[in-house]
């Protein structure tokens, strides 16, 4: 594929911002340290200003505040350099559109609705009574079981699976190995064994949701597990049955959300977070990586973390001993407080 080429004036005409210096041409985005004359880079954090002076980049995206320090360089001045960089990167890597057609090895059930604009890859499967929107891409070995509804321009990457009865909004993207709508982990103890509770709900994903590789979103026990518009979920995340996740929330890799958790909109959840079930997390909550969330978070905008920062093994071992002694130390402290209080009373 021939790389796209844009001048700075062409970029700003499309995306806004102000170009300064020469109206040079660029063919790709690169980090400051790797960029060459044909590349455009960006400065999002002022502490890396020295790297701009050392960089061979043909142009750099900067904020108005930072631009004054780079006279003689080719610049694009933007309000948010990082967001602007992302939009420039999209110019050079446009969304792939569906090539209409069904591969000869794909299986599409007769009762399925597949518009001519959809692309169905090798060995893909479309189940009975499933309806695809315009321009969907169901790539090699991907599976959409029966009675599903997919909006326009949905993409299922190779080996992604959508179980029966699920609903995906417009422009949803499901990466390889992800499973949408497998049975939730619902069991009732029968005295000497576990009885599986039928999971009769499904999964509903809003518009512009993205699901990373090998992530699982379980179907609801009775009502649907839901994910709101614009939410992005990383690789290897587990979303339990009956969860309700709001719009424009992001969840990083290896996080586990237990069943029946409600998460608000615009939340940021770091990697390796774990939650107990049946709790609520308010809008705009930020949870640091590795945190164990054991109770509801009811106040919007809280920033929470629950792990020790990295330390030497010797320091960690010493602190671990102190943790085990906290209960004993608390009792001793209460005894001392009581003794002090008794002493004051006798004076």
Curated annotation (Swiss-Prot):
Protein name (database record): UDP-3-O-acylglucosamine N-acyltransferase
Protein role: Catalyzes the N-acylation of UDP-3-O-acylglucosamine using 3-hydroxyacyl-ACP as the acyl donor. Is involved in the biosynthesis of lipid A, a phosphorylated glycolipid that anchors the lipopolysaccharide to the outer membrane of the cell.
Membrane-spanning intervals of the chain: none
SUPFAM superfamilies assigned to the protein according to its UniProt record, in alphabetical order: Trimeric LpxA-like enzymes
EC number: 2.3.1.191
Subunit structure, interactors included: Homotrimer.
Molecular function GO terms recorded: N-acyltransferase activity
Classification via Pfam families: Hexapep, LpxD
Family membership: Belongs to the transferase hexapeptide repeat family. LpxD subfamily.
Organism of this sequence: Neisseria meningitidis serogroup A / serotype 4A (strain DSM 15465 / Z2491)
Active site: 241
Protein's pathway: Bacterial outer membrane biogenesis; LPS lipid A biosynthesis
Coiled coil: none
GO terms (BP aspect): lipid A biosynthetic process
InterPro entries: Hexapep, Hexapep_transf_CS, LpxD, Trimer_LpxA-like_sf, UDP_GlcNAc_AcTrfase_non-rep
GO cellular component terms given for this protein: membrane
Keywords: Acyltransferase, Lipid A biosynthesis, Lipid biosynthesis, Lipid metabolism, Repeat, Transferase
Reactions listed under catalytic activity: a UDP-3-O-[(3R)-3-hydroxyacyl]-alpha-D-glucosamine + a (3R)-hydroxyacyl-[ACP] = a UDP-2-N,3-O-bis[(3R)-3-hydroxyacyl]-alpha-D-glucosamine + holo-[ACP] + H(+)
PANTHER family: UDP-3-O-ACYLGLUCOSAMINE N-ACYLTRANSFERASE, UDP-3-O-ACYLGLUCOSAMINE N-ACYLTRANSFERASE 1, MITOCHONDRIAL-RELATED
